Amino acid sequence: MFQDNPLLAQLKQQLHTQTPRVEGVVKGTEKGFGFLEVDGQKSYFIPPPQMKKVMHGDRIIATLHTDKDREIAEPETLVEPFLSRFVGRVQRKDDRLSIVPDHPLLRDAIQCRPVRELTHSFQNGDWAVAEMCRHPLKGDRAFQADLTAFITNGEDHFVPWWVTLARHNLEREAPAMVESALNDAELEREDLTALNFVTIDSASTEDMDDALFVQDNGDGSWLLTIAIADPTAYVVENSELDLTARKRAFTNYLPGFNIPMLPRDLSDNLCSLRPNERRTVLVCRVTITEEGALSNDIRFSAAWVESKAKLVYDDVSDWLEGNNRWQPQDTAIAEQITLLKRICDARSNWRQQHALVFKDRPDYRFLLGEKGEVLDIIVEHRRIANRIVEECMIAANVCAALALRDHLGFGIYNVHTGFDPALVEQAASVLKANGVDADPQALLTLPGFCELRRHLDALPTQFLDSRIRRFQTFAEISTVPGPHFGLGLEAYATWTSPIRKYGDMVNHRLLKAMITGQQAEKPQEEITVQLAERRRLNRMAERDVGDWLYARYLQPQAGTDTRFTAEIIDITRGGLRVRLLDNGAVAFIPAPFIHAVRDEVVCSQETGTVQIKGETVYSQSDKIEVRIAEVRMETRNVIARPVA
């Protein structure tokens, strides 16, 4: 009787049209229900039965209904799924396979099956790569995924590395070597093999790409010669090797090992500036004044050099600090170290006055056993030898930036524009509230930014520095010259690590064109996009492996009385993020661990403080004592508790 009733159809259409709808992102919880967050402002409750149609992170359109004075969102249309390609652990029950995504808020197993070309017989606990193929909001009965790759079995000690690399779709191995002969024989090279070049690196470094030589001019100035390994002498542009290097963009440094951008035979042998071996290089010569300024006599050339010594950071630092457990092999090497120290001091002083110098932060190095277990975490403080190399490399990169700018007008530049113009007023307000008067327009200029940074660096704590960091832009890679506010420099273009950075290889080719007077082509914008994306992925991979190893390392400390000194690095509504200063691990302190009565504690990202009953008890950058409360291995999260 009601079939094909036009009035009923019209009524249904009216109801559909009149039902309010919102678009937002699903936020899952551990309790089965969820929320639809709209524009970060409003959230609507999603009951457990409705949550079965969606997944945490899905962007959806939902209809709104009222139930007992509560607005409820009912998922209707999928706008963008959260999961497409992902990694997870396979569960096998009888002959049925399912996969649990490796994500803190995705705990439900998803039915899955291997794609036809995948021959591996999956077992319980295996790690795999999967692609979502079915979704309830697309009209399917349930979620389903295709298994597209086997990563490793659950017992593999190196799961953190293999799973992380698969998650970010990064290579596991070095590129294969392709027969590579010296291909730029027509390039005229100076013979500088008689000069006392030295390399300074870690003891374990094999890919040495920079060597240094100093000449004392006798008038207080020095002639610094920086020799950089020349892989473009072997890697022809657009060759198979070059396209591989372009895709990888960087050597990927992970705890315990690296995955090189170039074949190891090139990076660790043919191009590496090994002691007493003749190598092709690009050379930059520049006079450095007694005050530490770079003179205008910057000159680039191609050359042959022969490093006379492979020096180690700690050995050189010990010797310069008066600890004589190690001695340079002869007086010529000793003289080079002494002259390099003088250049370092002069350049550092000049940069402190005319540019910006980063505050020294320690590096943390995992000491691993044969099965990937963390034996120890070594805190490596930056010492004088590290600073010598850093000052020489910064000088070399400034020289390249200026030479490429003046001769070609383009290159691969590292650009950082300081404060975001849209946020600079907020930055000025925060500064003013903390007793620092700053003109927003002046902060957008390089001199104004440098002046502020020097003022902040002179303050007794880093509270204000960490507060205004969120108003700054990120460093970018550009094909045209631009300032680098973070370094306080007019222009900065790296060319000193061509074995491990593709952008530096591009700059090498441009410098060679400049040296020979040949026509040079401006790099394609796609290269900067690829470099930026690969840098982001490599950093995420390093962080993910680190989180996994920290969780393994700290698990035995959970629930014990062991104390750690920690620095507050971030304050969110839910609590504090802290860095343990002894080992570099990041831990989270939930607000209830700070004060039992939740209504009396306010954690404010806006002010960078934690207040209890209106009184500030913690501020960003404070040092506090903590204990490890819990380590959640499945999410690699470390939960800490302040020591009362």
Swiss-Prot record:
<comment type="similarity">
    <text>Belongs to the RNR ribonuclease family. RNase II subfamily.</text>
</comment>
<dbReference type="Pfam" id="PF08206">
    <property type="entry name" value="OB_RNB"/>
</dbReference>
<feature type="domain" description="RNB">
    <location>
        <begin position="189"/>
        <end position="516"/>
    </location>
</feature>
<feature type="domain" description="S1 motif">
    <location>
        <begin position="561"/>
        <end position="643"/>
    </location>
</feature>
<dbReference type="InterPro" id="IPR012340">
    <property type="entry name" value="NA-bd_OB-fold"/>
</dbReference>
<keyword id="KW-0963">Cytoplasm</keyword>
<dbReference type="GO" id="GO:0003723">
    <property type="term" value="F:RNA binding"/>
</dbReference>
<comment type="function">
    <text>Involved in mRNA degradation. Hydrolyzes single-stranded polyribonucleotides processively in the 3' to 5' direction.</text>
</comment>
<protein>
    <recommendedName>
        <fullName>Exoribonuclease 2</fullName>
        <ecNumber>3.1.13.1</ecNumber>
    </recommendedName>
</protein>
<keyword id="KW-0269">Exonuclease</keyword>
<dbReference type="InterPro" id="IPR050180">
    <property type="entry name" value="RNR_Ribonuclease"/>
</dbReference>
<keyword id="KW-0378">Hydrolase</keyword>
<dbReference type="Pfam" id="PF00575">
    <property type="entry name" value="S1"/>
</dbReference>
<dbReference type="GO" id="GO:0008859">
    <property type="term" value="F:exoribonuclease II activity"/>
</dbReference>
<dbReference type="GO" id="GO:0005829">
    <property type="term" value="C:cytosol"/>
</dbReference>
<dbReference type="InterPro" id="IPR001900">
    <property type="entry name" value="RNase_II/R"/>
</dbReference>
<dbReference type="InterPro" id="IPR011804">
    <property type="entry name" value="RNase_II"/>
</dbReference>
<dbReference type="InterPro" id="IPR003029">
    <property type="entry name" value="S1_domain"/>
</dbReference>
<keyword id="KW-0694">RNA-binding</keyword>
<dbReference type="InterPro" id="IPR004476">
    <property type="entry name" value="RNase_II/RNase_R"/>
</dbReference>
<dbReference type="InterPro" id="IPR022966">
    <property type="entry name" value="RNase_II/R_CS"/>
</dbReference>
<dbReference type="Pfam" id="PF00773">
    <property type="entry name" value="RNB"/>
</dbReference>
<dbReference type="InterPro" id="IPR011129">
    <property type="entry name" value="CSD"/>
</dbReference>
<dbReference type="InterPro" id="IPR013223">
    <property type="entry name" value="RNase_B_OB_dom"/>
</dbReference>
<dbReference type="GO" id="GO:0006402">
    <property type="term" value="P:mRNA catabolic process"/>
</dbReference>
<keyword id="KW-0540">Nuclease</keyword>
